[in-house]
Curated annotation (Swiss-Prot):
Pfam families: DUF441 (PF04284)
Record membrane topology: Multi-pass membrane protein
One Gene Ontology cellular component annotation held by this UniProt entry: plasma membrane
Protein family: Belongs to the UPF0756 family.
Entry superkingdom: Bacteria
Transmembrane segments: 14-34, 51-71, 86-106, 112-132
Protein name, UniProt field: UPF0756 membrane protein YeaL
Length: 148
């Protein structure tokens, strides 16, 4: 039996490799393995908890320099005294807000995920972009199409 979904996943994984977007390629390959093995019974759990677990892991990665001491408290304190750091803080707040909107929109309109994934891969492949922020991208989409 011909599995169109598997073919689409393989195509997206290939685009990930072609565009040097290892994160997307590996993620899709993991999902392919889950799909073609008995692990597929975990898809409901992955769909329900995957985004939250991913955000937790991402937050751990972002906070690690503070926890390890690589980013000393003095640097954090000085970030409130420099105008460039204040701009960075403001942008961080805006991006976090957009990411929150993105999570909401991805949950209510999951059909957007494929378009965002293709757009991310094309941006990396054609414009030497960096594959960051599908949640932020979805947040921007929510500003255009409305948060539903």
């Amino acid at each position: 039996m011909f599995d169109v979904t598997l073919l689409i996943l393989l195509g997206l994984a290939a685009l990930g490799f072609i565009s040097h977007n290892t994160t997307v390629a590996v993620s899709i390959l993991v999902l392919i393995i889950v799909r073609v093995t008995p692990l597929s019974t975990f898809f409901p759990w992955i769909e329900k908890q995957g985004l939250s677990i991913g955000i937790i892991i991402l937050t751990i990665g972002v906070m690690a320099p503070i926890a390890s001491g690589t980013l000393p408290p003095s640097t954090l304190i000085h970030s409130f005294l420099n105008w460039k750091s204040l701009v960075a803080i403001a942008v961080g707040v805006i991006v976090s807000w957009l990411g929150g909107r993105g999570v909401t929109l991805m949950g209510s309109q999951p059909q957007l995920v494929a378009g965002l994934l293709v757009g991310t891969v094309l941006g990396v492949a054609l414009f030497r972009g960096v594959p960051v922020g599908p949640l932020i991208a979805t947040g921007l989409v929510s500003l255009i199409v409305g948060k539903q």
